[in-house]
Amino acid sequence: MTVYRYVRLGQLAARKERGTWRVAESALELFQRDDGSDTADAVSRRSAPWSDRLSNRLLEGDSTGAWKVVEGALTAGLEPLDIYCDVIVPALERIGTAWENGEIGIADEHLATMLVARLLGRLGPSFNRRGRRKGVVVVAGPQGERHTLSLAMAADALRAGGYSALEFGSDMPLAEFERQLRAWLPLKGVCVGVLNGEAVDAARQMVAAARRIVGPTVPVV
C-alpha cells in the first residue's frame, strides 16, 4: 500500500499544503507504532482507531478519504450502528473539543459537520429493514436547537429496529410539533433531541406536550 493510500484511509495523519500531502515526523512515528498494515487479524481491525482516522479526514475536508475510513470499518466487521456510535460520534466529540480548546476554528468544525452529514446520507439506506414496520416514531428538536446530526442518527437507529421514523429536524415550533403528533396518531414513540443548553426548557415543553397527546403508555424520550 502506498503512503498516499494510508493518508486517504485516515491511518496516517497528514495536511495538504499547495497540492502536496505533508506528514509530520510525530505522525509517522505514531503510525509505525500502530502498524497500519492490512495483515492484522479481524479483532485488531475491529478495534483499530477508526474514529481518530475519521476525524483526521474530516478536518482535512477529505470527503473521499472519510468515506474510505467508513468503508474500511464496515469491512472490518463493524455494523452501521457501530459506525455511528463508535466511529462518527467520537470523531465529532474530538473535533468539538478541539474547537472549544481553540485548536481549530469554527470553519473547520462546520466543514467536518457538513462532511458527516454526507456520510449519514450514504449510510442511511443500510438501516432500512425489510418487512412490516412496528409503528411510527416522531423525531424532532425544539426551537433554538440547531444540531441535526444526532436526530438523524437516532432516526436511523429506530429504522434499524423496524420502526418508521418521521424526522422533523431541529428548531421545531411547539405548536407545529403538537399538530404533527396529532396527525400521526397512534404513535409508538416520540424522541426529542437537544444538545443546546439554551433549548432545554423548550425541549421540556415538547416532552410535556407529547405526553399529553400520546398518553401515558407511549415512550417519550
Region annotations inferred by a language model:
Residues 102, 118-221:
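C-terminal regulatory/effector modules of DNA-binding transcriptional regulators
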Residues 2, 9-129:
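Long amphipathic alpha-helical segments
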